[in-house]
Design a protein with these regions (language model features):
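Flexible, glycine/small-residue-enriched loop-and-beta-strand segment within the central core
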Residues: 7, 26-38, 43-142, 169-170, ...
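C-terminal/domain-terminus segments
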Residues: 37-38, 137-186
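Extended, small-residue-rich solenoid/repeat segments and analogous flexible loops
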Residues: 1-37, 41, 193-199
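C-terminal boundary and immediately downstream tail of ABC-type ATPase nucleotide-binding domains
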Residues: 187-193
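Short, conserved active-site loop motifs that form the nucleotide-linked donor/cofactor pocket
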Residues: 22, 90, 164
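Short, conserved structural micro-motifs that define repeat-unit consensus positions
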Residues: 18-22, 60-63, 145-148
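Short flexible/disordered coil segments
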Residues: 86-91, 149-158, 194-199
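Generic hydrophobic, helix-prone segments enriched in Leu/Val/Ile
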Residues: 15, 47, 68, 181-185, ...
């Protein structure tokens, strides 16, 4: 038996949309798959958890989620555009308890009503060719610009401009990636023997 689910098994899960050549490990877990859209040639590895909320999780073409990735979409939409990726054990949150509340004595436990907690919510967006390194955490409201990246074990608290690569805690800018070079590589990729996939 293949480690990846068959097409029939994928169709039976009831995704909002399902592209061609989607590879999902049998050990991956989906909560609310009816709000998850999967693009062509995406791959989700073992022990990953995709917990989609009402606004859904949209995964584009040629997107990779490494082993043990976690996406928590209860607080807003999650969008991973084409060629983006989450490396192993990376996590994206659309909702979290705010520790910066002016009211110091709120509680954290999610089993309690929101009146007792200070919640920060917002979408998480990874634009084309952006990536999150292993063990990194992306907090609510973050948009990673085209070609941007966060290296391993980085806490991404703020949106990243196009092409910016950061790493560390606190994060430091390591370099800038060139949009035209990434677009050239994409064109070269699609010009290979298999060509651009049907949409």
């Amino acid at each position: 038996m293949s480690r990846f689910l068959s097409r029939l098994e994928l169709e039976a899960m009831g995704f909002a949309s399902l592209g061609a050549d989607v590879k999902i490990d049998r050990q991956a877990v989906f909560i609310n798959p009816d709000t998850v859209s999967l693009g062509d040639h995406c791959r989700i590895d073992a022990f990953s958890l995709i917990s989609a909320g009402a606004e859904g999780v949209r995964i584009g073409r040629y997107v990779h989620l490494g082993a043990s990735c976690q996406i928590f979409g209860g607080g807003g939409a999650v969008l991973l555009e084409d060629f983006s990726c989450l490396s192993g054990r990376a996590t994206a949150y659309t909702s979290s308890v705010s520790l910066l509340s002016r009211i110091k004595n709120l509680m954290f436990n999610p089993t309690l009503p929101e009146a007792f907690r200070s919640i920060s919510q917002g979408p998480v967006i990874l634009r084309k060719h952006s990536g999150v390194g292993c063990g990194s955490v992306v907090l609510p409201g973050v948009e990673m610009g085209f070609g941007s990246a966060a290296g391993a074990l980085t806490l991404v608290r703020k949106s990243l401009p196009e092409g910016v690569v950061i790493c560390g805690n606190p994060p430091q800018v390591l370099l800038h990636r060139d949009r035209s070079e990434l677009e050239r590589l994409e064109e070269e990729f699609f010009a290979m023997e298999w060509g651009e996939p049907d949409i």
